[in-house]
């Protein structure tokens, strides 16, 4: 039963404080690597099946020491930046861990970065504009992986499949370091995401946990349906990186045989995880939110003037506490835009996400503030329209954007991907489907289908799998001109 609504006078400010336990770990990645090597020794830690490489905990520690010695012999000194430009390969981890040992910030590079952008420890993916370089400390990532892995309740017997790119904080910290922290084995199916490779691992290995962003799960589910049978040992699925529609969660639980679904939230600037849904059986009541804040993390919802709103009211989600980045590398202006100090001297990081904190202290993300569509003065959230669209039996994936309109400012546009071998619904049928639950003003006026002329064969995505909505807006604007 839903909790009763409090009168406005009885509602509390929308601010939550994470637990003060467990104790913050004051160690470095290098020391942690040696400690875990002593504990787990010959237990398998990581595997790259496509490279036929498997490393134990002791082998990871030994190899990273040898690489560290080689880097020092090459003339590198404490504080020098070491660039890593590769996909999900074992060499990535060797260099990353070696850099951590000798105090050299690892600069995680992507192939599409310009030289001027290659400047810091972890690069923010960014669905628009140039990625910014978020500077994270050992304290940040060690403790974030510690708290997140505890919330996921990993066991040493777990075998984890992660198709997430190591060049992003979700894949590097929330997947690899969390697995490492708990003594698990983690598999990286291939260098770059391949749904076929993921399904091969799920069906041929005793995988108990899978990570992914929504677009990855859509692709993997499609391949699983084509092969006709579920993974044989799946227990948990962990998603993040973008809002996860409840219809997708339901499909993951049903088609993958998942018992527990965990919905994480964060951003590179917060190390990255700040929220995670409670560990419970797949159910609508527990999975409509991103859960509660992690330990040593605080969150609040503010209005456009920076004032804390009341519980149940929408506003921008802000984060403070242990997970905050030091700032953007050599960019005080960008740092000051996103990180502000309140009257009490507390630094808050503005996420750019619209959210609600309920009376049970659970948080719900309602969309990116910059993605909100303003149609004739009405604010429309793309997320709720996307959730409705993918409930249609013939629509596999959807992305909703605002498109310019001379009279109303913006109209609702959507880009849709149909299931293979399914009949495409008419545009009017799509609008009627949305109007049925959400009202006439949220029905898309401009409808585009992936695969049609001028659209492309797939959604434009970042390296981490997020839809690039700015590119979709450009495509839609051009086609409507």
Curated annotation (Swiss-Prot):
EC number from the UniProt entry: 6.2.1.-
Binding site for substrate: 268
Binding, ATP: 124-132, 263-268, 353, 368, 466
Gene Ontology biological process terms, A to Z: fatty acid metabolic process
Lineage per the UniProt record: Eukaryota, Fungi, Dikarya, Ascomycota, Pezizomycotina
Protein name: Acyl-CoA ligase cnsG
Function: Acyl-CoA ligase; part of the gene cluster that mediates the biosynthesis of communesins, a prominent class of indole alkaloids with great potential as pharmaceuticals. Communesins are biosynthesized by the coupling of tryptamine and aurantioclavine, two building blocks derived from L-tryptophan. The L-tryptophan decarboxylase cnsB converts L-tryptophan to tryptamine, whereas the tryptophan dimethylallyltransferase cnsF converts L-tryptophan to 4-dimethylallyl tryptophan which is further transformed to aurantioclavine by the aurantioclavine synthase cnsA, probably aided by the catalase cnsD.
Keywords: ATP-binding, Ligase, Nucleotide-binding
Keyword ATP-binding carried by entry: yes
Organism this protein belongs to: Penicillium expansum
